[in-house]
Amino acid sequence: MDVLSAAIAVMRTGQPYSNRLQLGEQWCYRFDRYDGIGFHVLLSGTAWLIPEQGPSIRLDAGDVLLMPHGSPHHLSDSPQVMAAVPVEDATAGDGPADFLCGKYRLDRSRVHPLLAGLPDVIHLSGGVGAHPELDAAITLLAAEVDATRQGQSAALTALVDVLLVYLVRAWLDENPITGWPKAIHDP
């Protein structure tokens, strides 16, 4: 088994979760610290990621975020935090921002050094055209989240796992590699 596969297999506990968030004109949602990994894919519109530490990041359609350490953050229609609502209380809107989100719980007592070495926020900007497999996984996951069918839970679990692998691969392909991430490229 390769290093990335082992890192994910050893840590995951529980059932992955994924959903769509279509948001109205003015909104700001708070994502509290989570004991796992979370992701956001902006399918359409524009938005802002406001991390707990660091500058706000503008998001455009096709941008993908990975929060490898479950760091608290906000998603908003503006670069400043307004009166934030917990994401659990989010209500659907008819605005242009449409997110595909997901998360799964990790056993932090068994953190693999590869995942521990990732930054708090991974932002793949400008679409993901350079990574067609990531595009395909996003398309499949979005279709599965939108439908209610037999086997949906099993499909969502598998697709969230695949999406995580492709997100980490894409980041490793685009960034200088040091430490444990570098080790996976060393035969």
Question: What name fits each language-model region?
Answer:
Residues 1-64, 71-92:
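Generic protein-terminus/edge-of-domain signal
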Residues 99-100, 104, 111-139:
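Aromatic/histidine-rich interaction motifs
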Residues 122-128, 145-160, 164-187:
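Short, Lys/Arg-enriched, Trp-marked, Pro/Gly-tolerant hinge/linker segments that flank
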Residues 44, 105-107:
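Solvent-exposed residues in well-ordered beta-strands and their adjoining turns
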Residues 73, 77-79, 110, 167, ...:
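Short amphipathic alpha-helical interaction/hinge segments
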Residues 43, 138-146:
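Regular secondary-structure segments
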Residues 38-41, 133-137, 159:
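Amphipathic, well-ordered alpha-helical segments in soluble domains
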